[in-house]
Regions:
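A structural signal for short, well-ordered beta-strand segments and their strand-loop junctions
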Residues: 117, 139, 186, 227-229, ...
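Active-site loop/helix belt of alpha/beta enzymes
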Residues: 144-236
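Glycine-rich, aromatic-flanked loop segments that form ligand/cofactor-binding clefts
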Residues: 133-147
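Short, well-ordered, mixed-charge alpha-helical segments that flank or form enzyme active sites
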Residues: 82-83, 102-105, 124-127, 146-151, ...
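A charged N-terminal "starter" segment
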Residues: 1-136, 175, 179, 183, ...
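Anionic group-transfer/hydrolysis microenvironments
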Residues: 29, 55, 76, 121, ...
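Positively charged, low-complexity/disordered segments
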Residues: 235-246
Length: 246
């Protein structure tokens, strides 16, 4: 497919007469068309929600556009949580996934009612000590270890990653969280970056659904959603994080 710039050289020449360079110029129509296409593609699933990675483009105007299509915010820092709140996103539209998380960030995420995604097994006790309870809805990040391989070769090496919980840790984490008051559970995974093949998505979804069946059998937890995460880059600029089965 041939890609055409959304703006012409003549239009750019006119724009710079008013706005000095450098500046960012966004294609609002393209953003809206893509947001609409994603929403329509998964309309068969009434529980679907796309969560946009705020760190990719922390621009309130763009977030407000995506909000019109019922998208949520994927946040990884206090600042991103603040930005999401200022744009009017409520807790169920905010997914908080972070690493080496300071206490004040967990506390603020809980205050907003955001869905907290725990990256590490030790975060269970830390979260409880920080906010005084375990939220009714909680998510955990899964790391299967080994390598993540598609038909065209190895995509990434989760076994070398310090992020996420092993299957055994995840099972134990769900049991502990349930005993501490959690009622609804989610599973998050981010196994490869810069994927350019459609094979990645169904393969990851299949692995996660099989995992959920096992988690349900071994913990009895009510697993409400899967947060399937992915990062793409186009010219090192654009990144999007997907949650197609939330």
């Amino acid at each position: 497919m041939k890609k055409e710039p959304f703006v012409t050289k003549a239009q750019l020449d006119e724009i710079i007469k008013t706005y000095p360079t450098p500046f960012h110029l966004y294609d609002e129509k393209g953003i809206r068309d893509n947001a609409k296409a994603v929403k329509e593609a998964f309309s068969w699933n009434p529980g679907f929600r796309e969560y946009f990675a705020v760190k990719a483009t922390p621009n309130p105007y763009i977030l407000k556009i995506l909000q019109e299509y019922d998208m949520g915010c994927d946040c990884s820092s206090y600042t991103e949580l603040m930005l999401s709140k200022s744009c009017g996103f409520d807790g169920k539209h905010i997914m908080f996934s972070s690493n080496d998380t300071p206490a004040e960030e967990f506390a603020y995420a809980d205050k907003l009612g955001a869905i907290i995604n725990l990256d590490d097994f030790t975060h269970i006790d830390f979260l409880e000590k920080t906010i005084g309870h375990i939220p009714e809805t909680i998510s955990c990040r899964y790391n299967p270890g080994g390598v993540f391989e598609l038909s065209n070769g190895i995509m990434d090496n989760p076994g070398d990653s310090k992020y996420g919980m092993t299957k055994d840790q995840l099972i134990e984490a769900f049991k502990i969280l349930k005993s501490k008051g959690a009622k609804y559970f989610g599973v998050h995974a981010f196994l490869a970056s810069n994927t350019v093949t459609n094979e990645y998505y169904p393969k990851l979804a299949g692995e996660l659904f099989e995992l959920i069946v096992e988690l349900k059998e071994k913990t009895g937890c009510d697993i409400k959603f899967v947060n399937r995460s992915e990062e793409r880059r186009v010219g090192k600029e654009c990144r999007s994080r997907w949650s197609p089965y939330h």
